[in-house]
Each structure stands twice: as C-alpha cells, then as structure tokens.
Amino acid sequence: MEPQYARLVKSAALAATALASILLLIKIVAWYHTGSVSLLAALVDSLVDIAASLTNLLVVRYSLQPADEEHTFGHGKAESLAALAQSMFISGSALFLFLTGFQHLYSPETLRDPGVGIAVTVVALFSTLLLVTYQRWVVRKTRSQAVRADMLHYQSDVMMNGAILIALALSWYGFQRADALFALAIGVYILYSALRMGHEAVQSLLDRALPDDERQAIIDVISSWPGVKGAHDLRTRQSGPTRFIQLHLEMDDALPLMQAHLLAEQVEQALLHRFPGADVLIHQDPCSVVPEGRQGRWEL
C-alpha cells in the first residue's frame, strides 16, 4: 500500500465528514427560519451525507489494512461495499424527497424569510464545490472507488444546492410551487446518481476487468519485450488500490527454464513500473503447447 494513497484517501473522507456536519447545523437553522421544503430536502441530504461519509471513513480505514492470513488478497473490496452502501443511503434520501415534494406540490406553503435560505444555500453551494474539486483530484491520484462514490454524492449536492437557490428565488417572487417542483427534480437526479453508483460498485464486486486502455497498456509493455513470442489468457481486476494482472507468456521451446524464469521476472518488473502496486502473476508457456491459431498473438 502506497503511503500517499492512504494519506489522500483518509484526508478526503475526513474532509467530507467535517463539511457535512457543519452544513447540517447551518441548514437546520435555515429550515427553521424559512420552512422551505427544498431546504428540508437539503437538511435530510446532509444527514445522509454524514452517515455515508462516516461509513466511508470507517471502511476506508479497514480497506487500507494489509493482507492477512484470512484475507490474502487484502481488504480492498471493502471500498466497493462502501460505495454500494452509499448508493442505498442516497436512494433513501431520494425517496424521501419524492414524498415531501408531492405533499408540498398539492399543498404549497408560503416561505418565511427566504433571504436566510438563499444565504445559507450560497454558502453550502460554494463549500461543497470546493470539496468536490478536492475529491476529484484525489480520485485522479488514487482511483479510489470509495472516494469516487463520495464525490458523485457531493456532486449531486452541488446540483441540489443550485436548484434550491433557484427555487427559493422563484418562491420569493410568488411562485410557491417552484419549491416542491425543484425538490422533485432534485430527487430524480439523486436517484439516478445512486443507481449509477450502485452499478459501478456491483461491477467491482463481480471483478470486472480493468478498462480497455489499461489492458492495452499491459499488452504494449509485454509485446515490446525481446524473447516474448506472444501472450494470452490475460485476466485483470481491481480491489481497492490494487490491480491484479494474470497472463500467459509464450516463449521459445528451447529456452532454458532459468532464462524463461528471468524473462518472466523482467516482464513482471516492467508491468510493476507501469502499474505501481499491482499484483502480477505470469505463467510461462512453450510456443508448441499453444494452439496454432493463437500462437504469436497478443490477446486482450
């Protein structure tokens, strides 16, 4: 486990938890003063944010533990479980928004002091935007699925705060149902984000292969190595920060065992240089045991 990965992932989880806690307190005050259903939706979403971010923080700490006798491949899959749990949290908040939005659509209420709600929403919008910017940078550096799930969650918050701002402004000018309509629209977007996040988490738990560009990069590395005649049965997956790469290398039949071993070691080191922290397993095949139609090919 790279120290930078652990540091960045932990800092992103802590930042999200701290921001969600602060915004929750601010939104409680704003909702009390305005009675806005959109702000109530934002308040509930902040409660979900705290639960999700705390879950994320605990799971990230667990996933960063090194492999042990009972978990020989490490604990990285915990990140996918965290993302799946987050999708459930977010789906619950979306359903709450639908119920509350429909209720206020048919029984609209006049907002009290919408100026307070607008001020609070502006603060929430810009602070969440800063958090998402930091999370996106962490995801680019670490490819952490847990942080990516959290980022998608807070991206929906940015959209929600923008919609709330418009709804409060319209309500201020007499469009009483705008508050409820925007709450319903926000609910649709949040539910979509939750389903997308859940799909990604399930795919990871099912050991989906690495992206095509990364698999092609693996082939590019080994095909440029002298002495390697071909490769097949490439299998890849990712668990937390660790990529798992397995493949069969095709070598000349007359190559001595020690030379074949050294060649495989060199290819492994080249792959580790391209994908730091990866777990690489290479099987050496004499060309003669490979079916004729597959010899000398570089198969993804």
Swiss-Prot record:
Pfam family, one: ZT_dimer
Localization, UniProt: Cell inner membrane
Record's bilayer topology term: Multi-pass membrane protein
PANTHER family to which the protein is assigned, alphabetical: CATION-EFFLUX PUMP FIEF, MITOCHONDRIAL METAL TRANSPORTER 1-RELATED
Self-association state and partner proteins as the record states: Homodimer.
Family from the record: Belongs to the cation diffusion facilitator (CDF) transporter (TC 2.A.4) family. FieF subfamily.
Name of the protein: Cation-efflux pump FieF
UniProt lineage: Bacteria, Pseudomonadati, Pseudomonadota, Gammaproteobacteria, Enterobacterales
